[in-house]
Regions:
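Short, polar loop motifs at secondary-structure junctions
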Residues: 28-32, 86-88, 123-124
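Internal alpha-helical scaffold of NAD(P)-dependent oxidoreductase catalytic cores
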Residues: 39, 91-100, 116-150
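NAD(P)+-binding Rossmann beta1-loop-alpha1 motif at the extreme N-terminus of oxidoreductases
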Residues: 1-56
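Conserved beta-strand termini and adjacent loop/short-helix elements that scaffold enzyme active sites
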Residues: 26, 45-47, 104, 142-145
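Rossmann-like NAD(P)(H) cofactor-binding subdomain of soluble oxidoreductases
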Residues: 15-17, 40, 47-119
Length: 155
């Protein structure tokens, strides 16, 4: 499974280190994608390249960039794993109508495989997504209606 990260900040770094495998990274011009790619044996590429080459994409950009990034990934039908704060499944579904969507909020210890990942989905995520996220630590399924509260408590 080829994994891509849109956004290469602290949470992308923690997840990428926790997964401990090469991935593709993009950023909005900060240069962090190249730094993260170097640290993980991955590759810094454009968002469009991630859409072409990846089956699973982690959304680690700023929530206000959702529409812009979704346009760059137009038609993507793989798996979207969102770590966007305050962005519910409805907004993600509207942005990615063909994708399988999982909303998550991991904490920083995921970089050591010892974190907690809150997860909400419209239906049961694919087994490979459970397995992938399970590499980061403990998965906690949370109803969408309680997601914001759970992530505030789980920090």
């Amino acid at each position: 499974m080829t994994i891509g990260f849109i956004g290469s900040g602290n949470m992308a770094r923690a997840i990428a280190l926790g997964l401990a495998r090469p991935a593709l990274f993009s950023d909005s011009g900060s240069g962090r994608a190249a730094t993260l790619a170097d640290a993980t044996g991955g590759e810094a590429v454009s968002t469009a390249e991630i859409a072409r080459r990846c089956e699973t994409i982690f959304l680690c950009h700023k929530p206000k960039q959702l529409s812009e990034v979704a346009q760059a990934l137009a038609g993507f039908s793989g798996k979207v794993v969102s770590v966007l704060a305050a962005t519910d499944l409805g907004a993600l579904r509207a942005a990615y109508p063909k994708a399988k969507i999982v909303r998550t909020m991991p904490n920083i210890p995921v970089q050591y495989g010892e974190g907690v990942v809150a997860i909400a989905a419209e239906s049961d995520p694919a087994a490979e997504i459970d397995q992938l996220l399970g590499e980061l630590g403990r998965l906690e399924r949370v109803p969408e209606a309680e997601f914001e509260l759970a992530t505030a408590i789980g920090g």
